[in-house]
């Protein structure tokens, strides 16, 4: 392995993109925003193609943005760092407000460095549920459009993790291994890059199927279910290439990412299966 060190990719980018006065702009949060923006723009186009009004669509971004942000943050704090965030009052404040209580008693703006993808998905569900209830729209249509767009957002989220040198893989001697200098000097699987590439491929695949079959030739819930099934099945298996993120995972048969992926895979399979029934019911109504 030592002889091959020169062939590995040495990865040590500065996670900070820029400083704006007291504020720190990080690649991680920037990638999140780019991913959400691209998803929003694509969904806006889908809404127009499907003849859905701008008045109905405009509020959706805010529901999803805050749902993903709050859910992702709570998911990280509760599932991955409960011993820090749930033990002291000032740490509890840091769960939702991107500030850190300094030893001298002052507060420092830090930006969100910890957002869990599973928590973001659950938060997105809550945001969409509130949106559909308040705007009186078909939830399955919204979820299908989300399923078509989510892959591109997930791609940029994982690129943000890569820029942060976090969620690193296990030690390996594959020729494309990364040496994450901020962690240690061992070549490791670039798990973030694996996921980013896979999610981008899933995005292209789902978009291709949608363009071929459209929204009406399949039952509602199909694209949403396909997205959940593809992404979280891959996520389940790619976890085997990653280092554990929290100590208590070492004693578990599966890590937290795998445990949280299982209900989402089941939901995805159910959504695909039940979409056939909804398609048949729709055809009967049309006759």
Predicted regions: what they are:
Residues 1-287:
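A feature for loop-to-transmembrane-helix boundaries and adjacent hydrophobic helices
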